[in-house]
């Protein structure tokens, strides 16, 4: 095994994500970072479909990011591993799994809009993972751009303590550059790609506000740095280096967010933003050691090359040339190509064929990876998103798993020709392996293939990829809502499966107490005493319930949030069997549906609508007609109206077209799953009747 010297010290690594609402200029920002760091030598524009990071045909046509593209750049002696994530709400899973393996992030805001609906979602995800962030207020040259208001929106809408470390010089078409509040110097830019800014004295008309803003910055970081607090109390000035160190310390708490400004498209302020990434975002050594489960114990994994190898697989992708690519983040140790690893999640041994350093969809083969690296492996057959990989000789442990939302929308698919059936099956298998929020199954009653995902665009992209990548033409049914079932009452139910007609019969008999188990999923409790049901049959009672819950008891939808306590029953020495107890348990659930108050649940979506003020009344009325509950309305600084509402998914099909026609093409909206709620009786009755489920 060849062990090479480490090229970059771990303290010089920055593993970061670029995250934002759709159209905030996130991918353009990433392109500029790659250009300035010498990773690419020509800039490709997203709106022209030429972006380096948006490499999928669907991304280039639609001008949006769908998958998380990974790349590595170098800046001032630091190695920056960058993941550019999607801004569209249907692809939130890509953001979720990227943030899980990153140490820091740049949140890109549109200077005119400030915080937008999807900004809230990705910000919340980053907060869950305690990811330190920098705020980059982009598009400062846009009409209506306002740096101060955009930063304030982080505080008011996200509760994030965002504080400017720069102040803008001009805005909209007059945007020229910024004042560096740490070093108290001004930079202006000519808009050329190289972004060689000119350092100038702070313009006289901005000296007063620059001093005020620097003092606000000092006051804000004083809460995190005692030395600065003492200097502030004594009325002394704070030197630049001390202030810089304090900003870094504050940022690493994930409670303080330095804000910078610029225009990525117009080549203004991006280099200073990369400097801020280096200066203020953490290395793998600055973040708390990751926790892992070792049996019943929680252990911490120290970020060091000297420890056993450990990594988390955070993305699986099908590549037409090399097969399955598994993206992983190394948390400890060293791994050479050709080595064996243990997938500790599945307890399987796997061989790493090749290790690739990725740049969007191009790649460079490398010999090894070390702590802090993000790379892709070729050759892993059983590893899926969220699995832990450890060295062959390491003591078994599992890094904390990722939890993904269940799909809320489904469609039936049929291959256009019989010849395409096998290709369809292969394509769906590969695509569901890549995306944990995409599910596919066969409807037992109709024999149709069903695909399920997070939204209409999500399923559109899946169908498009089947056509392009797997050569499968399909006929697509109308989108369907993924309802759920649950129980609302507690009852003790008997389940019997007894058949005795000569020869060996069947005998299973159970008494189960069923209770609602709100938001806790399925819970099975064994309270059998005195051997009334032999131990070996208990797990088959549980299995019978689980299998029945998958297909439901009302209308064929999964049954959720049930606690089942097996407390009595009986058995027969000869006729009892595993199957008999599975059937008896299943019957208990089916027979008890009336006593248990079985009911249908419908998915409720968070809907955020942005419209010109003139259309406010019409849109409010339309949302109410769709059974929407209005949660909040606001008028933005640019005069647009925003409406937040909770609306059943079943009422939102075709909304994009309806909104366009109601607002003459000037309205837009975002929608994301929020929760399941009891469906109104008339709707529930109609669905149950239509499904004719026995």
Swiss-Prot record:
InterPro entries: EFG_II (IPR041095), EFG_III (IPR009022), EFG_III/V (IPR035647), EFG_IV (IPR047872), EFG_V (IPR035649), EFG_V-like (IPR000640), EFTu-like_2 (IPR004161), G_TR_CS (IPR031157). GO terms for molecular function: GTP binding; GTPase activity; translation elongation factor activity. GO terms for cellular component: cytoplasm. Its main location: cytoplasm. SUPFAM superfamilies: EF-G C-terminal domain-like, P-loop containing nucleoside triphosphate hydrolases, Ribosomal protein S5 domain 2-like, Translation proteins. GO terms for biological process: ribosome disassembly. Residues 11-285 form the tr-type G domain. Keywords: Cytoplasm, Elongation factor, GTP-binding, Nucleotide-binding, Protein biosynthesis. It holds the Pfam family EFG_C. GTP binds at residues 20-27, 84-88, 138-141. The keyword Endoplasmic reticulum does not apply. It is found in: Cytoplasm. HAMAP family: EF_G_EF_2_B. Belongs to the TRAFAC class translation factor GTPase superfamily. Classic translation factor GTPase family. EF-G/EF-2 subfamily. PANTHER family: RIBOSOME-RELEASING FACTOR 2, MITOCHONDRIAL (PTHR43261:SF1), TRANSLATION ELONGATION FACTOR G-RELATED (PTHR43261). Catalyzes the GTP-dependent ribosomal translocation step during translation elongation. During this step, the ribosome changes from the pre-translocational (PRE) to the post-translocational (POST) state as the newly formed A-site-bound peptidyl-tRNA and P-site-bound deacylated tRNA move to the P and E sites, respectively. Catalyzes the coordinated movement of the two tRNA molecules, the mRNA and conformational changes in the ribosome. This is Elongation factor G. It comes from Mycoplasma mobile (strain ATCC 43663 / 163K / NCTC 11711) (Mesomycoplasma mobile). The gene is fusA.
């Amino acid at each position: 095994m060849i062990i090479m010297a480490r090229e970059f010290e771990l303290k010089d690594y920055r593993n970061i994500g670029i995250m934002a609402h759709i159209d905030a200029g996130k991918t353009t920002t990433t392109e500029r970072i790659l250009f300035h760091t010498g990773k690419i030598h020509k800039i490709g524009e997203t709106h022209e479909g030429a972006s380096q990071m948006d490499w999928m045909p669907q991304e280039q046509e639609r001008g949006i990011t769908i998958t998380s593209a990974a790349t590595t750049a170098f800046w001032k002696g630091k190695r920056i591993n960058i993941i550019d994530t999607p801004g569209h709400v249907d692809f939130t899973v890509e953001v979720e799994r990227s943030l899980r393996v990153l140490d820091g992030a740049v949140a890109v805001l549109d200077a005119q809009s400030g915080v937008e609906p999807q900004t809230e979602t990705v910000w919340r995800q980053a907060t869950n993972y305690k990811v330190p962030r920098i705020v980059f207020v982009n598009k400062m040259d846009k009409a209506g751009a306002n740096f101060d208001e955009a930063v304030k929106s982080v505080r008011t809408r996200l509760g994030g303590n965002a504080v400017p470390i720069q102040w803008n010089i001009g805005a909209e078409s007059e945007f020229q550059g910024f004042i560096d509040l740490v070093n108290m110097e001004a930079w202006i830019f000519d808009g050329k790609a190289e972004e060689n800014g000119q350092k100038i004295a702070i313009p006289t008309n901005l000296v007063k506000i620059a001093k005020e803003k620097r003092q606000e910055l000092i006051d804000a970081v004083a809460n995190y740095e005692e030395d600065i607090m003492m200097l502030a109390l004594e009325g002394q000035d704070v030197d630049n280096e001390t202030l810089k160190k304090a900003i870094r310390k504050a940022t690493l708490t994930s409670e303080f967010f330095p804000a910078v400004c610029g225009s990525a498209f117009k080549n203004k302020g991006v280099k200073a933003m990369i400097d801020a990434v280096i200066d203020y975002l953490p290395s793998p050594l600055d973040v708390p050691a990751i926790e892992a489960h070792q049996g019943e114990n929680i252990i911490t994994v120290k970020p060091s090359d000297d420890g056993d190898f450990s990594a988390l697989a955070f993305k699986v992708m099908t590549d037409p040339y090399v097969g399955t690519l598994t993206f992983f983040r190394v948390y400890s140790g060293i791994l050479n190509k050709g080595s064996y690893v243990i997938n500790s999640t599945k307890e399987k041994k796997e061989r790493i064929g090749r290790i690739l350093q990725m740049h969007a969809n191009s790649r460079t083969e490398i010999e090894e990876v070390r702590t802090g690296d993000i790379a892709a492996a070729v050759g892993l057959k059983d590893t899926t998103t969220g699995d832990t990989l450890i060295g062959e000789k390491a003591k078994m442990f599992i890094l904390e798993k990722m939890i993904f939302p269940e799909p809320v929308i489904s469609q039936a698919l049929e291959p256009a020709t019989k010849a395409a059936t096998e290709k369809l099956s292969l394509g769906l298998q590969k695509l569901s392996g890549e995306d944990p929020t995409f599910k596919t199954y066969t409807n037992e009653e109709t024999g149709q293939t069903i695909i399920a995902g997070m939204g209409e665009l999500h399923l559109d992209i899946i169908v498009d990829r089947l056509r392009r990548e797997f050569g499968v033409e399909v006929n697509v049914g109308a989108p369907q809502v993924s309802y759920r079932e649950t129980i609302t009452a507690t009852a003790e139910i008997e389940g019997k499966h007894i058949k005795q007609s000569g020869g060996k019969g069947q005998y299973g008999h159970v008494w189960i107490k069923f209770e609602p188990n709100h938001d806790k999923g399925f819970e099975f409790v064994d309270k059998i005493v005195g051997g009334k049901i032999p131990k070996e049959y208990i797990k088959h009672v549980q299995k019978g319930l689980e299998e029945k819950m998958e297909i439901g008891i009302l209308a064929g939808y999964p049954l959720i949030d049930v606690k089942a306590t097996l407390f009595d029953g009986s058995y027969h020495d000869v006729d009892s069997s595993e199957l008999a107890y599975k059937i008896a348990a299943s019957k208990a659930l089916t027979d008890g549906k009336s006593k248990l108050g079985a009911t249908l649940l419908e998915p409720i979506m968070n809907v955020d609508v942005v419209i010109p003020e003139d259309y406010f009344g019409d849109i409010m009325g339309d949302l109410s007609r769709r059974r929407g509950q209005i949660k909040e309305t606001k008028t933005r600084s640019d005069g647009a109206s925003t409406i937040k509402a909770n609306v059943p998914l079943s009422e939102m099909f075709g909304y994009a077209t309806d909104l366009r026609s109601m607002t003459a093409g000037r309205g837009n909206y975002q929608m994301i799953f929020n929760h399941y709620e009891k469906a109104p009786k008339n709707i529930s009755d109609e669905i149950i009747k239509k499904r004719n489920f026995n």
